[in-house]
Swiss-Prot record:
UniProt EC number: 4.3.2.10
Listed NCBIfam families: hisF
Keywords: Amino-acid biosynthesis, Cytoplasm, Histidine biosynthesis, Lyase
Main location group: cytoplasm
Catalytic residues (positions): D13, D132
GO BP, one annotated term: L-histidine biosynthetic process
CDD domains given in the database record: HisF
The keyword Amino-acid biosynthesis is assigned to this record: yes
One Pfam family in the UniProt entry: His_biosynth
Organism: Aliarcobacter butzleri (strain RM4018) (Arcobacter butzleri)
Protein name (record): Imidazole glycerol phosphate synthase subunit HisF
Keyword Cytoplasm: yes
Amino acid sequence: MSSFAKRIIPCLDVDNGRVVKGVNFVGLRDAGDPVEVAKRYNSEGADEITFLDITASHENRGTIVDIVKKVAQEVFIPLTVGGGIRKLEDIYSLLNVGCDKVSINSSAVTNPNLINESSKRFGSQCIVVAIDVKRVADGSYHVFVKGGREDTGLDALSWAKEVYDRGAGEILLTSMDTDGAKTGFELNITRQVSNLVDIPVIASGGAGSMEHIKEAFENGASAALAASIFHFKEIDIMDLKKYLRANNIPVRI
């Protein structure tokens, strides 16, 4: 387990330029405005912010670029954008307006060379590969795409190793079994992937309490990503960091 400061990353779903999956902050003028929400998280002590662009229609993809441009002018913690990134030009257009990292998922599975090409061109520190996993009948974990609907048949550990070998700078590991359940992260796969690769692993899917986040860090994760527990103020980020520090987890306060 690395001794570097562990990171807390709120994740915002953005559809056609608006934050969806409700953000319930008292005193926030417009909870659907990504700039407002990002500023709030910045002031509350988040280490990074991830935007997941879930805009279905390809013609509206330019909107996320406009958002990143606005957010980057107001917020000074790293921004990651995922969703719909298929080619080098998509990555360039986001990095060019102030995005720090991009997260690629399905496109990495269909075109693994995108990992090599993007990390060579932009630097591996910019390239996060998102891996959505589910446990299958034989007890192993498979990689799923299309929002967890389609089993690729790929073994999650083999894919994580390949992603690392191809030059990814981080892995965003989401357990589809625990996602949204608030019952805790899938620690088994978090630990296995963290032990296998020599790059940071971001645990995602299942955070419901401060203890869950502590457990993810104790099982090798370098960062924890969550949405609703932060959006609905069930957990305050500063309180969480104080709790983690009291439990000997290194964090930036």
